[in-house]
Amino acid sequence: DCLYLNIWSPRDHSSFNAEKLPVMVWIHGGGNTIGTANTYDASLLAGSEQVVVVTINYRLGFFGWMSHPALRTPDRNALDASGNYANLDMIAALQWVSDNIANFGGDQNSVTIFGESAGGRNVFSLMASPLAKGLFHRAIAQSGSVGTAPRWRAENFHDDTQPGQALSSREWLSLQLKNSGRAKDSKAARAAQMLMSDEETRDFMYSRSPQEILEGVSGGAGMYSAPQSFRDGTVLPQDTLYTVFSDPSRYNSVPLITGTNRDEAKLFLAQDPEFVELRFGFLPRVKDLQAYNELSAYLTDSWKAMAVDGIADIIAANSSEPVFAYRWDWDEGGKSWLIDYSELLGAAHGLEVAYIFGGFDGAIGAPGLYTDNNIAGRDLLGQQMRSYWSEFASTGAPGNGRSGVLPQWRPWSNAGANLMLLDTASGGGLRMVNEPMTVAMLKERIAQDPNIPELRSRCALHVQLFLLANAGDDVWDEADYDALGCAEFNPWGLEVER
């Protein structure tokens, strides 16, 4: 019972006004397994920028995505068989907005979808979905990713020749059979489910309570790595999004803003005891700052290479619709003898969201991150970002912002500065730069990095960046992997080891 949405409309704008306002539909993040629209207060964004903001909920994790042969038998319709139930929730929300938003002063012909992290991933998926055609007119992906999953990755056992994810539907079903007492161990559960008919499998799945469905599933901050965004051929194309976005006739080609944060990975590394220890049980300290920064740079740069430069290059080369790219660089978190947030987090994943919505109290953070010393810079940067975002929602280009006084944000091109850096004056301010990051550059860096002494470690990093993270298998090239000297290591075997 989660399919609700929230609407913020400027107080001084009546639904009876002849001029309707741009609409911004927010898709929350959380790995597509946690989170809620109710976390986000869009009153400042709506009121200060004169836009109507809608925040939506959708089914999460196994409830939102479940791909299994028993769920797509011939008697099932294509939507039920897709397994992409959460994507369908988002499309239903957009249809509701199209049908009803005029009653709240919004223009159904000027709808911008925007989301962060998993929400950004969902933005890219909606761009690719033929079922979302005409329901939105602009898109913003904040720290998104373009990864989609083939059926085998979502369904196979983890040790199959084509290995499924650790929580593929068959692995999850084995867990359910063990938890219910119908199998004593994984081997017995595997044998049992292979003997079950499609009807028996469905009946068993449907009999499990929400609590039972999640029993034994764990992950950081409540998140877990469930398969999602399946290439089903109905809700999402059967090709990778890199392939789809190469042809504007195959997706919802609209103006796009895409960007990442300069230190994305530090949010996750900061919670990993391999890299960060807790003094007195609560004060984090980076164990090896050089190693911490180097791994963060690899993970973060691969994110930018795939979700910003890679996507922008493909769309700019093939579509007449503009792409605008950014990198968010704010790293002025509080510093004391106890903790230095500029080192621990820097410009970490998710921190930019508070600047869009304008509230820092409930933002990702920790005591001492936001201080009186950095409040003036934070507030101004937030105003500037909201101005750019709302101008894009209004016109399809961030330009000089809604205020008309900001540095011009130019579209992506292969010549000159094409990336907007978003930072306070003490960090250099708002400015256009040319700082490319490509998959080829990263592969060469791994090959030449003197700080990776072991071949196996080099190969494992290659697998982590180009097979498992962000873009899924969009950029995987077996020949490149072999050329690195990794042919002796099964890449999926390296995944299992981690």
Regions found by a protein language model. Name each.
Residues 1, 19-21, 27-91, 99-103, ...:
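Cap/lid segment of the alpha/beta-hydrolase catalytic domain
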Residues 11-23, 49, 108, 250-254:
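Proline/glycine-enriched tight loop/beta-turn segments at coil->beta junctions
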Residues 22, 97, 104-117:
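Alpha/beta-hydrolase fold nucleophile elbow
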Residues 313, 317-498:
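Mobile gating loops/cap/lid regions near enzyme active sites that modulate substrate access
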